[in-house]
Structure formats: C-alpha cells, structure tokens
Amino acid sequence: MDIKEDDESRVITPTELQLHDSVTARTGTLWTAVAHIITGVIGAGVLSLAWATAELGWIAGPAALIAFAGVTLLSAFLLSDCYRFPDPNNGPLRLNSYSQAVKLYLGKKNEIVCGVVVYISLFGCGIAYTIVIATCSRAIMKSNCYHRNGHNATCSYGDNNNYFMVLFGLTQIFMSQIPNFHNMVWLSLVAAIMSFTYSFIGIGLALGKIIENRKIEGSIRGIPAENRGEKVWIVFQALGNIAFSYPFSIILLEIQDTLRSPPAEKQTMKKASTVAVFIQTFFFFCCGCFGYAAFGDSTPGNLLTGFGFYEPFWLVDFANACIVLHLVGGYQVYSQPIFAAAERSLTKKYPENKFIARFYGFKLPLLRGETVRLNPMRMCLRTMYVLITTGVAVMFPYFNEVLGVVGALAFWPLAVYFPVEMCILQKKIRSWTRPWLLLRGFSFVCLLVCLLSLVGSIYGLVGAKFG
C-alpha cells in the first residue's frame, strides 16, 4: 500500500526549524558545550597525526599542532560573536547554523559557495571512512594471523582492501535508509564512545612502546625523503592531515544555540572553546608525539593498522573493531546532511511527483508487524551516493593523501575565510585599518598554507596511484 509522507518522515524546512527552535528551552552549560566540541573533533583524523608529526619532525610537528590550535581558537572566537544579529550581545535574532549565518551576513552567493565546500568536505569524509574501515577490517584478520603464525608470517589477505570496501558499502546502503538525522542519536553516541576508546588505546600502546624501547625515536627533520622537493610536498601533505583533524566551525553555532543565558552565550562559548581546544591539543599531542616517539622513521600512516603493534593482539583487534563501529555510525553522520539537502531540493522542485513524494509501507515479521516506510527516490539517491563514495575509495585507497586533500580544501574557507568576513561586517571594521589588515593578513597566510597543502596532497595522491 502507499502512504502519504507524514510529519515524521518528511524533510523539515529551515523555516520550520527556526520556529521549532524558538520554543526550545536552552539549558546548555560551559561543560556541555565542551563535551559537544570534543565529541565532534575526536575521530578518525587522530590516527594520522603520528605520521604527520613524523614527517614534520620534532620541531615543526609540535609547532604545527600548536599553530592549528591557535587558528581554530581564533576562528571560534570570531564565529561566536556572530551568533546574535545585529548586536553580538543583545541582538534579537539567533543564528543556529553556520550556513544561516553565512547567508545573513554575506548573502546568498556566499551561502551557496559555503554549502558546496561543506558538502565536498562531507563527501570526502565518506570516502576517507570507507578507506579506513577496509584497512581496519583487514588489520584485524592480519593481527590474528600474526598471533597464530608469528610476526614473520605471510599474512597478506589479498593485495588490496577492495573486498572490505565493497562489504562496507553494502552495509551503508542498508544503514542509509534511516529516515533522517533525528533518528540517529543512538548511532552518534556509539560513534563518539568508540572514537575515544580507540584513540586512548592508540596512545596507551604508543606509550608502552616507548617504555619498551627505553628511548625516544625521531629527529628534528622528520622522516627523510628521496630528495628535497619530495620532502617539501610530503610536509605540506602532513599539514593537510592536521588541518583535517582540528576545526569545529560547522557545529559551533549549533552548540552555542543550546547554551542558557545569562551569562551571554558568546562568553560561555568562548570559554568552552578555549577549554575544548586546550584538551583537543593535549590529546592530539599525545597521539602525534607518542606515536612518533615510539616508531620514529617507521611511523605508519595509520597508527593502529600499520602493524607497529603486534601485542597484545586482542587489544589491537579491539581498537580496530572500535574504529569499525565508529565509522559505521560516522559515515552516516557525515552523509545524512547531504541526503537531507538533496531530498529537500527534489521535493521542493517536484512536489507532485509520486516517485519523489510518495512513501510505501511494508509490514515485516522480523519487526513484529511494524510498518516500514520506504520512498523510491530516497532508496535510489542514497544507494547511488554510497556506490559513488565506495567507487572513489576503491580507485584511490590512500588514507593520508585523501585526508590531506579534504583537510586542505575545507580548512581555509570554513575555519578562516567565512568567520573573518562575517566578523568584519558585523563589527563594521573599516578597510585598511589595523584590525582589518590583521584579519585579512591572517586569512591570506592561512590560504597560502592550505593551497600548498592541497597541492602537496594531490601530488601525493597522484604519485600513490600512478607512481
């Protein structure tokens, strides 16, 4: 039988979200904001930080981590001032999303550019997660093989991860039929717990390796390359990996919208950002520096799948299993906004088309007779998206290179350019004054770094594919 789209399954429009938000009680505090930020930034990106630190060396590696922390914190301060409009302290209009703020301050064209960058970033995360989950699944099998047959055994399990990527893609085709983001709270919670678990295991294993070695590995210049030009591009690729891990600009205004007042939301948000960035940086230092200190020039691109650790094999397996569970949920967290935007656009453009607007109900015995609602457009669109991300991952299964490209593409526009431009407009900073020059200079330097990181990451991606 067919069922008309009901309130639960349809896509909510921005106007309805704003009306719904206006009657929502805001009870958030400093510590809930800190928790939201930390949960949002601790993810698969931490697995590459040891490699990035190793490529940069003992001086440039920690310095880069601190520099990106400073840029992220400044971005958070600028963005938190844009939450209320037009006055940052008492403005009557609250902006509860990043895109909404960009549209109001910078106009429709900038909102479109912002949306394109966001969706490219989310798409890139889906590709990266597909690569990582295949690597981790294969690592679990190899770990058990090494434990049974010795560390010198031939445990290849094929020459690539394509089989595991296809399995993950099939799983995500099913998972992608979850109606919308509001039905995924449990999935996000599991993903957050898993990300912290495997990150702490990685730190613990690296620290144990340092104690076992009784020395700190590594050098000031980092891992040597074949020539100076090669080293330069790898360094910029490493910066792209760090850029992927740090920013939380996209979720900042949504978190700020949960805060109660007084005190003013921007004050609480700035304090929360400071605490969160401090914790984040300390955590990233542990992941990056402990990993490099443990393995030196042999630091793997992915700390938990490069087989620097063989024992305890059960703990290595458990860490990789946590990554798998995290990425099953994490893939959906990054994919659902793309699904929602595409479906909202098609529904608005073709409201009477049955293929797009009609839902069909089926009763499944396994669900105790409950009716499952399926929409043909949703099934086709989401399946096609999963197939594309899986296909790209199979074509370019290079973890660090893909992270570098995604990080370099998204960091400057989302964490620097838009916050700076909105701040200049909101505070009415006049051209060629000292604050204007400082903000524009800051934005320009970050742009140069991100462009070089993008070129370095693309160079590495092409080299890995065709070299």
Swiss-Prot record:
Keywords: Amino-acid transport, Cell membrane, Membrane, Symport, Transmembrane, Transmembrane helix, Transport. Pfam families: Aa_trans. InterPro entries: AA_transpt_TM. One of its GO terms (biological process) is amino acid transport. It is found in: Cell membrane. One of its GO terms (molecular function) is symporter activity. It comes from the Eukaryota. The chain crosses the membrane at residues 30-50, 59-79, 112-132, 164-184, 185-205, 232-252, 275-295, 313-333, 384-404, 405-425, 444-464. The keyword Amino-acid biosynthesis does not apply. Residues 1-29, 80-111, 253-274, 334-383, 426-443 are cytoplasmic. It is a multi-pass membrane protein. One of its GO terms (cellular component) is plasma membrane. Residues 51-58, 133-163, 206-231, 296-312, 465-467 are extracellular. PANTHER family: OS05G0424000 PROTEIN-RELATED. Belongs to the amino acid/polyamine transporter 2 family. Amino acid/auxin permease (AAAP) (TC 2.A.18.2) subfamily. Amino acid-proton symporter. Stereospecific transporter with a broad specificity for neutral amino acids. This is Probable amino acid permease 7. It comes from Arabidopsis thaliana (Mouse-ear cress).
